């Protein structure tokens, strides 16, 4: 299906997990197995499974987890949310079981936003947003993971989103809480204090000057389209 999605409803992750781990520069080993090939996903959509990095006793885990999560008491009442608002994630009831111990990182290369078309405001134009220096991004995330051979329906993750007034392409929009590698390391440090976590949530998002963006093909609206042409400027 074709849909125009708000922030942050689609993103790309196309390097190998080793590249993201190298940029994090953690002195921790990944204690579970993961794929070393390039991930090559240019259009990650909600409810699909995608790689996240999370702390584990003795190191890190890399897991493929469904993007979208609800607590057990809200399952099936609506579509699982894919984002958690920075303003309420620490205090709200909905994410209580994930905060703060479900902290994870969703590595990415960029994300998409849809902006009303100047020529025809009823239509929307997708834009792709990436780091101006071309390096990887780390989205602050919260995850519930139940490892096993089969995906567990309780497992899922959400991306934390930053306040609307710091939007990029569209001033009214929200953006993922994008962390520098330094803050990303802190985010998944088991020893971090809740006060420091609150600081990162409130002020840790990389500034809009760190990013560049450009219009891309409307093909990204269809989740079946997955190739690198989706992130080429039009």
Short names for language-model regions:
Residues 1-234:
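Short linear sequence motif anchored by a di-proline
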């Amino acid at each position: 299906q074709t849909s125009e999605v708000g922030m942050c409803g689609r993103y790309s992750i196309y390097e190998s997990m080793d590249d993201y781990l190298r940029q994090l520069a953690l002195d921790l080993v990944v204690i579970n197995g993961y794929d070393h090939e390039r991930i090559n996903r240019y259009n990650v959509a909600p409810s699909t499974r995608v790689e996240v990095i999370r702390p584990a006793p003795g190191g890190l885990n890399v897991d493929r987890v469904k993007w979208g999560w609800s607590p057990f008491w809200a399952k099936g009442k609506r579509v699982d949310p894919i984002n958690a608002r920075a303003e309420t994630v620490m205090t709200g009831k909905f994410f209580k079981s994930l905060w703060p111990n479900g902290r994870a990182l969703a590595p990415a290369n960029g994300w998409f936003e849809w902006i009303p078309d100047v020529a025809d405001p009823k239509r929307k134009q997708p834009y792709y947003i990436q780091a101006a220096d071309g390096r990887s991004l780390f989205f602050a995330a919260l995850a519930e993971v139940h490892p096993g051979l089969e995906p567990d329906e309780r497992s899922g993750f959400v991306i934390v989103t930053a306040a609307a007034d710091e939007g990029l392409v569209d001033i009214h929009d929200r953006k993922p809480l994008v962390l520098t590698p330094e803050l990303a390391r802190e985010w998944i440090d088991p020893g971090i204090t809740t006060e420091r976590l609150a600081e990162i949530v409130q002020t840790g998002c990389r500034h809009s000057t760190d990013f560049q963006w450009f219009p891309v093909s409307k093909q990204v609206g269809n989740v079946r389209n997955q190739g690198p042409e989706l992130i080429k400027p039009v």
